[in-house]
Amino acid sequence: MEKFNTHTGVAAPLNRSNVDTDQIIPAVYLKRVTRTGFEDGLFAGWRKDPEFILNQEPYKNASVLVAGPDFGTGSSREHAVWALMDYGFRVVLSSRFADIFRGNSGKAGLLAAQMEQSDIELIWKLLEQQPGAEITVNLEDRTVTLGTHTFGFDVDDYTRWRLMEGLDDIGLTLRNEEAIEAFESQRASFKPRTIPAS
């Protein structure tokens, strides 16, 4: 997983509340067994509309999504996070996230930054005035900067640490590789073992 410290990118305003995982990526797109290639399913129902925000020229390369409250509700679907990331998003800003979505995001490398709704609405207003404007998200300082405006955001310390270190679940496990090998070397030979990668 790539380390996350600071990200600057075009921000897309998604002025909708209660965006659930089925709207983020419909179930019909969940049939593949890999973790990549889901970008075509992202907001598939809405992207058919030429007026949808991600179909507008200033936002086609957006990497920061500024969403309404209750983003990522619905079924537990890692594919929702993967679709956002495959499309190019590194950050989602919202005033409220579904807990499972927020957890899946941090584990996959997507920053789900929780902000005050009044700040989200001001960012929407600023983006309406400057379509295609870039936002800088600083995870170390927990700030979002758009032009002369700086806002704070919340993310729990553990998720922040994982993102800044670039640690997914496998990366976390590999930090203990020596201890795992030491344990395996002392384990009785008749018990199951992990086989070293060749």
UniProtKB/Swiss-Prot annotation:
What SUPFAM superfamilies is this protein classified in? LeuD/IlvD-like (SSF52016)
| CDD domains reported in the protein's UniProt record | IPMI_Swivel
Q: Which InterPro entries match?
A: 3-IsopropMal_deHydase_ssu, Aconitase/3IPM_dehydase_swvl, AconitaseA/IPMdHydase_ssu_swvl, IPMI_Swivel, LeuD
Pfam families to which the protein is assigned, alphabetical:
Aconitase_C (PF00694)
Report if keyword Disulfide bond is assigned: no
- May I have one GO cellular component term? 3-isopropylmalate dehydratase complex
What sort of enzyme, by top EC class, is this?
A: lyase
Indicate the quaternary assembly: Heterodimer of LeuC and LeuD.
Family the entry assigns: Belongs to the LeuD family. LeuD type 1 subfamily.
- Sum up the protein's function in the record's words: Catalyzes the isomerization between 2-isopropylmalate and 3-isopropylmalate, via the formation of 2-isopropylmaleate.
Put simply, this protein is called: 3-isopropylmalate dehydratase small subunit
